[in-house]
């Protein structure tokens, strides 16, 4: 199997590192592999007919739920609009790409040759999608509690998020 910029041993090491950083060991490594398989890789490798977009769909919902619950519990006196802005700051493309980099997903995602050449490993949109797929895989493998344990250490303190959301929307902070 060709991994484009990674040999099989390096990829196995990257998967191990991801699990260590996430504090979660997959029961089914196939889920982790699928979460890290980009459509460009699958289209070039008939032995990998599936890619991570369905897991991305699921992971997006899991991420929104967990972040919403965290904000709801931590900010009991805050109105819905502010909660929504805070959630948006925690689940946007840039934030998700940061979580992906923290876990080392950028080193392990399987990309097609052209996507790899074009810098896909550095692109926030691709990495953010990979993080959502990863979280979806954790959810399927270990449940919502496992997904929450993986996500919690990646998120900044709620106060920091709330302060930054107010600065980004000063008119809303005054209302």
Predicted regions and their residues:
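Double-stranded RNA-binding/processing signature
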Residues: 1-175
